[in-house]
C-alpha cells in the first residue's frame, strides 16, 4: 500500500506525495512549486520521482512541473482539455492510468475549471480531487457553471463513504465556519469545527477527509437537506428548492462570506 504525505507549498497549498516503499518510487500531485519536492528528493536520495499528476491548469498547481520534469525525467499526466506544461499523457473522463503500480480511474469534474479532473482508486479508497471538493467546501467557479459544479460534486459524493479525500488547500477551518453559518444546529458540523480548530492551533493539517464526513458536514453536498434549503432561501429569496439552485445560492453566499 502506498504512503501519502503532504508537502506544504505557498500559503495554504498541499502537494501530495505518493510513495511506494518497496520500489522506492514516488509521485506528486499538483506541484505548484518545485522546491518542496526537490528538497524531499534530496533528503531521500534513493527515491525516484516517476510521475507528476495534474488536476487542472491553475499556476499554483502546475508552476513547478517543468522544473521537476527537467530535474527528474518524471512522466507528466494531466487533463487533455487544458493546457498543462510538459504533459506526456492526456487524460479524459473514465481513462485509466497506472501510477506506482496502481490503476487510477479519471473522473471529469468541471466547475472550478472546465477541464478539471480527479484521480480515483477504488481498492485504495483514494480520491485526489484538486480544487473541486474541499474539506467542508468546494472550489470557486472560475470557468464552469453552478450546474456543472453541482453535477461534479454529486458524482464525487456517490463514491463509497470510506473514500479518503485529498484536496489541495488548507481551507477547512474557513469552510467549516461557513458550514456552521448554514447549519448552526448540525451537531456534526459543530463537532468538526471544534476539532479542526484544535488541530490548526496545534499546527496539524486537517486532511485527508472522507466522503462520509463530507456528506455529514459539507453544505455543498447537502443541498437536498431541509435545513440547507431553508438557509439558501433565507440568503437568496429567489432560490428554489432544486438542488443545483440551492448549490448556486450557497456558492454565491460563500464567495462573499
From Swiss-Prot:
One of the GO BP terms on file: methylglyoxal catabolic process to D-lactate via S-lactoyl-glutathione
One example GO MF annotation: metal ion binding
EC number from the UniProt entry: 3.1.2.6
Keyword Metal-binding: yes
Catalytic activity: an S-(2-hydroxyacyl)glutathione + H2O = a 2-hydroxy carboxylate + glutathione + H(+)
Database matches in InterPro entries: Clx_II_MBL, Glyoxalase_II_hydrolase, HAGH_C, Hydroxyacylglutathione_Hdrlase, Metallo-B-lactamas, RibonucZ/Hydroxyglut_hydro
Residues binding Zn(2+) 1: 56, 58, 112, 131
Pathway assignment: Secondary metabolite metabolism; methylglyoxal degradation; (R)-lactate from methylglyoxal: step 2/2
Binding-site residues for Zn(2+) 2, renumbered to this chain: 60-61, 131, 169
Record bears the keyword Zinc: yes
Co-factor binding comment: Binds 2 Zn(2+) ions per subunit.
Cofactor: Zn(2+)
Record's keyword terms, sorted: Hydrolase, Metal-binding, Zinc
Family annotation (Gene3D superfamilies): Ribonuclease Z/Hydroxyacylglutathione hydrolase-like
Record family assignment: Belongs to the metallo-beta-lactamase superfamily. Glyoxalase II family.
Subunit and interaction comment: Monomer.
Record PANTHER family: HYDROXYACYLGLUTATHIONE HYDROLASE, HYDROXYACYLGLUTATHIONE HYDROLASE GLOB
Chain's role: Thiolesterase that catalyzes the hydrolysis of S-D-lactoyl-glutathione to form glutathione and D-lactic acid.
NCBIfam families attached to this UniProt entry: GSH_gloB (TIGR03413)
Name this protein carries in UniProt: Hydroxyacylglutathione hydrolase
Gene label: gloB
